[in-house]
Amino acid sequence: MAQTVVVGLGRSGQGAARLLQATGHPVSVIDSGQGEQLEKKAEGLRQQGVEVQLQAPLAIDSFRPWLDQLQRVVISPGVPWDHPTLDDLRQRGVAVDGEMAVAWDALKHIPWVGITGTNGKTTVTHLLSHVLCQAGLAAPMGGNMGVSAAEMALNLQQEHTTAPDWLVMELSSYQIEAAKRIRPRIGIWTTLTPDHLERHGTVEAYRAIKRGLLERSDHAIFNADDPDLRQQRQSWTGGTWVSAESAQPDGHPADLWINGKGWVCDRSQPLFPAEALAMPGAHNRQNLLLVTAAARQIGLSPASIVAGLRSFPGVPHRLEPVGRIGNAQVFNDSKATNYDAAAVGLKAMQGPVVVLAGGSTKQGDATGWLEELNRKACAVVLFGAGTEELHGLITGANFTGELTRRTDLTSAVEEAVRSAEALGATSLLLSPACASFDQYRDFEARGDHFKQLIHQVQSGLN
């Protein structure tokens, strides 16, 4: 009988294995790791009838027990799509899919909103799901954050509930690359700046992956304020273009924009005031327009959209307020895992700001981030594996504020609190500009630790 092997015991791998097993597909899982936590995950799947092999690297030898029956291999987002072993399997006639493709097969009867982009996609995903749900639609979110798409499919099957009206799915370049048959009803492209180049090689390759999702969408929505997307506009026919800056971005008419009086407008009339969304920053005005365009495409009235915007609580780890320490408002922006996202967060702050930055550095242009540091920051506290590299970048940009180095976030928070008080900062911001994997499982774990440390400081002051 045709066999499927799932590579990786992470969240997406577990979800894919459980979904395949529940839908009658013989499935096994391999993972190169070992240890107590991984063994617990493996045992949980074994109890559900899924064979799991640990300490099994991504090599042909790991697949030999099933090679005669092997029909498909399902990879987690962290596995390179062009890995030599996967190419070997393809040459043997084995199909290679990502977890998102498995989920699509089970969920394609429900209309999807597929949201991608270098930055902004998490906020747009949360906000759109919230607006739709507030309007009475069942529109759960998942994908690259929260519940994996495979877990969502499995939960819907097991609960035997009425199918949702919409699925609001955040899709990373890794997921899109490994699931080219996904065809969303609505596709949203938030931004495009260089990221994940260590995986994709070039900006052109990275762009092409994201573009593919929008080309396969029935209706596409674009952020005309993003320089890269704006340069591509001539190559697109149709779609909805939004701008928080102008009714005529780069000489082309926008379909939805914010006018000089602060109102969201379409080509026929003003719709509602943009202040309906109380989140700071120009980037969130762009996010507001992308969500509004999608909600109107789905059929919501301006009044319903406004009600959802006004009740939106915000996104964890994205400029998330964490109270005050002295005169400084504290923000958790752990989701800022690259220079561009960190610069966007800094732009939304009122200075002077004490910034905590660090982690695993990524390839990318740091120019905009360094400019914002010079403009807004009175002090920068560095921590983690990228400390020396970031220190060199910041000193090379002639930063005139305090610049200190610490080994970890705990000691960095202590230093940042001291600096904020001594320098009279109005904001204290965790804005790593780096991935979290040097010291944390993911950016959520890093942000949660930051909030815990801040709450400890606040408790000591009370």
From Swiss-Prot:
ATP binds at residues 117-123. It is found in: Cytoplasm. GO terms for cellular component: cytoplasm. Keywords: ATP-binding, Cell cycle, Cell division, Cell shape, Cell wall biogenesis/degradation, Cytoplasm, Ligase, Nucleotide-binding, Peptidoglycan synthesis. InterPro entries: Mur-like_cat_sf (IPR036565), Mur_ligase_C_dom_sf (IPR036615), Mur_ligase_cen (IPR013221), MurD (IPR005762). The keyword Transmembrane helix does not apply. Pathway: Cell wall biogenesis; peptidoglycan biosynthesis. The keyword DNA damage does not apply. It catalyses: UDP-N-acetyl-alpha-D-muramoyl-L-alanine + D-glutamate + ATP = UDP-N-acetyl-alpha-D-muramoyl-L-alanyl-D-glutamate + ADP + phosphate + H(+). It comes from the Bacteria. It holds the Pfam family MurD-like_N. Its EC number is 6.3.2.9. Belongs to the MurCDEF family. This is UDP-N-acetylmuramoylalanine--D-glutamate ligase. It comes from Parasynechococcus marenigrum (strain WH8102). The lineage of its organism: Bacteria, Bacillati, Cyanobacteriota, Cyanophyceae, Synechococcales.
